């Protein structure tokens, strides 16, 4: 089993000598029975002091990933204006879940905040998923985050029935 590797890419703030890395999920992502806990540093954006070779901070989007939600895009370095016209240098990460992480480059704090949302437990014997995952309010997700029966394909009756049966048998 592995931890979060540099999966999505790397960006560097040359002036501050900070490296930003988006990480993958802990292997094997579909089975977390033998890797208990949050699997720190996986599914994260981390900041590393290049000169001193030290971790400055990490921000984990998904804890104990069993859904293949690694951060597959490289971090984007930019600046935004927030409260009272204050300019903040940020690192932005777009994720497979449709979230856009906007983090302070120096602290790793999420600029817009989040809430912790209770999530369903796994039905896999021995699997201990995190009880809560982060739910980001802003920026609004750029992709749909919930799938229900109304979303099943209607391209053909055969396809619709096939997917409906698959979902029914998983419940």
Model-derived segments and spans:
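Beta-sheet-rich non-transmembrane sensory/scaffold domains
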Residues: 1-171
């Amino acid at each position: 089993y592995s931890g979060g590797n540099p999966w999505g890419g790397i960006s560097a703030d040359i002036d501050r000598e900070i490296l930003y890395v988006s990480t993958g999920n802990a292997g094997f992502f579909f089975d977390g029975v033998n890797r208990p806990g949050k699997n720190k540093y996986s599914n994260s954006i981390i900041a590393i002091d290049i000169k001193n070779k030290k971790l400055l901070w990490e921000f984990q989007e998904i804890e104990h990933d069993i859904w293949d939600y690694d951060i597959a895009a490289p971090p984007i370095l930019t600046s935004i204006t927030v409260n009272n016209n204050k300019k903040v240098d940020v690192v932005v990460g777009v994720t497979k879940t449709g979230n856009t992480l906007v983090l302070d480059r120096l602290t790793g704090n999420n600029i817009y905040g989040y809430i912790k949302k209770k999530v369903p437990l796994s039905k896999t014997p021995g699997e201990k998923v995190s009880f809560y995952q982060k739910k980001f309010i802003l920026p609004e997700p750029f992709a749909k985050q919930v799938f229900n029966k109304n979303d099943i394909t209607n391209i053909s009756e055969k396809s619709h029935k096939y997917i409906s049966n698959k979902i029914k048998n998983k419940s």
